[in-house]
């Protein structure tokens, strides 16, 4: 790609399943300028990556969480006939299921991710270059309000 598009900036997203500083640094060495880390990472894991590579780091701060590790979901393909690993997740973990006793519920559905003031301050202290808000297929008003919320947190406004 660098040969055909030498001036293009390359970002590695969550589908690359970047789980440590070795993988992030490898991507930097082959020409990537930024990686989007999986939503499941702890602050300590993010900090360790930050301390061991100079690649830009981007972190999701709001949106749907998955029961699978980012980039490794096969449920959508099996249950919804759409690949979650190709950006077409059918969100089978958000569906209602019935167990063998006939009880129904959202057994696989984690709560949505929503970072607040303390989490944003931790990311700032770690030295994260960019935050990411899930906005695909969302109402424009939702996106506006969510982005405004995070802008105020970053700028430390009420």
Q: Language-model segments: which ranges?
A:
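Active-site pocket-lining/capping segments in soluble small-molecule metabolic enzymes
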Residues: 1-18, 36-130, 137-158
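Hydrophobic alpha-helical bundles that form the membrane domains of multi-pass transporters
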Residues: 30-31, 136
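Short, glycine/polar-rich helix-capping loops at beta-to-alpha or helix-loop-helix junctions
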Residues: 19-23
